[in-house]
Amino acid sequence: MGSSFVIDRSSSSPAPPRGPAPKLSAHARKIICKISPNRSFLFIISLHICEKYFISMGLRGHRSRFSRSVSTFFSPGKLACIAHLRVGCQIVPIFPYGAFLKTPYNRCAGNKVSESTHRRAVVRPSTRYFVTTFQDTETQLIIVSSVEVKKRKGIVILSIEFQSMHLKQRVDHHVVCLKGLVRPGNLVRLQQTSGTFLHFSRP
């Protein structure tokens, strides 16, 4: 697990919109971000479409909001395309079913992490959906390819399939506290644990 993914740098990232930053309306600023205790992760819980491709978010423990240029519209259940991101932060967007295989990342170096594909397919209203996480090239890249939610005797079971450079594995987790939380359009926190490699908790 020490090796990292090879990042495709063959294509160039889309250019951000030019001109002054537009004023975000109160409705467009209703974006919820959660940051883990170690302040190395950024979790986007909900996103709203802004006309001028600007969103408001928090980074690295700072809960203040500021505009960041993005290369496509944001919306829960739609593919997020981020143009600028500080190294050391981790974005967790929701991807459409099967989209992670067709979504190469590029220019994952320096102070930019970008994604080149403009897909807007909405996640189907089912319990099976895809989330991905990525970090800078100096850390291990982990892709959670699928999460299937089942209920047995009131306990939510997350059947998780994830991939890394030399590993493909499926793990079942029995999580009681996630009732009604893990569903398409919602995000849960993904973190590494000592006992099991993946763990989901409330954002």
Swiss-Prot record:
Q: Where is this region: Disordered?
A: 1-23
Q: Which organism is it from?
A: Saccharomyces cerevisiae (strain ATCC 204508 / S288c) (Baker's yeast)
Q: What is this protein called?
A: Putative uncharacterized protein YEL075W-A
Q: What other remark does the UniProt record contain for this protein?
A: Partially overlaps YEL075C and YEL076C.
Lineage at the top is:
Eukaryota, Fungi, Dikarya, Ascomycota, Saccharomycotina
Superkingdom to which the source organism belongs:
Eukaryota
